[in-house]
Amino acid sequence: MDSSSISRWFEYESGHAWCESAYKYQTLPYVAEFANTCTNLPIIVLPLVNIMLLRRYLHDVNGGLVFPQLLLTFNGLASTYYHATLNLFGQLVDELSLVWIITVFLVVYIPVMKWFPERFSKRLTVVRWVVLIVTAVVSALCFLEPNLNAIALMLFSIPAAVVIRYEGKQSGIPDIENFPSRILALWGVAFSFWFADRLLCDFWLYLGTPYLHALFHLLAGLAGYTIFIMFSMIDIESRSKTHRYTAAVRYFPDKNGSIFSFPYISLKERSQ
C-alpha cells in the first residue's frame, strides 16, 4: 500500500458526511460537525460512571466487566474524532469499535447468560477464542473493503437484540424486568433518527434543524449504557454466592425511572 493510499484514509471529509455537514465548520473552524461531535460526551462518560460505581465488585469479583465498558468509552472518542474530521479512518474505527463492543461483551458476559447451552460450558475458552478470531478476521477485511462493516454490524446487532430481550426477561431480577423494553424503545427511536437524518436531509435543512444524528448519539448512548447496567446486575446476581455484595437499580434525576432518566447501580456490602 503506497503513501497516497494511506493518506486517503486521513484526508478531511473522505468519510461519510451527515446532514449537519451542511453547516460544517461554522461553530468551530476545526470541527466539521459540531453537534454530532459534542453529543458523544455521554457515550464517553456514562460507562466510566458505571465502572466507578462498581469498582469494589470489579476489584473483588469480576474485573473482566471493565473491558466492554471501556470499549464503549473508546467508541465515543472514536466517534468524536470521526465527526470532527469526517475522515475515512475515523469512520471505520468508529464503526469497527461497535463490532468489538458486541464481541467483547459476549466474551465477558457469556458465562452468566441463560441462552448459552450448559453442555458447552466446559469449552467456554474455545468458544471465546472462536468469537475473537472471527471478529479479528472481519475487522481486517473491513479495512480492505470498508462497506463490509455495515454488513458486520447488521449480522451482530440483530441477534444481540434477541439476546437482550431474552436475558432480561429470564433474569428473575425485578429491578431490570422492564429493561429490555426500555433498551429496545431507546434503540428504536435512535435508529429512526439515524435513518431520517440520512434519508430526509433536505427536509431537515429546510427546517434549519439537521441535528437528528446528534439525537441518535444521545439516545443510543443511553441505550448502550442501560445494557451494561442490566448485564452488570445479572452478573452480580448470578455470582451472589461467591461475594458479599447486594445491588439495586436507582434512577437520576427522576427517581421513578422515566424513559429518559439515567439508571445506576447502588452497590452495598451485605450486613454480617
UniProtKB/Swiss-Prot annotation:
Topological type in the membrane: Multi-pass membrane protein
Role summary: Hydrolyzes the sphingolipid ceramide into sphingosine and free fatty acid.
One term of GO molecular function: N-acylsphingosine amidohydrolase activity
Essential cofactor(s): Zn(2+)
Organism: Caenorhabditis briggsae
GO cellular component term of the entry, any: membrane
Protein name as it appears in the record: Alkaline ceramidase
Residues reported in the UniProt entry to bind Zn(2+): H83, H213, H217
Keyword terms of this UniProt record: Glycoprotein, Hydrolase, Lipid metabolism, Membrane, Metal-binding, Transmembrane, Transmembrane helix, Zinc
Keyword flag Ligase: no
GO biological process, one term: ceramide catabolic process
Entry's family note: Belongs to the alkaline ceramidase family.
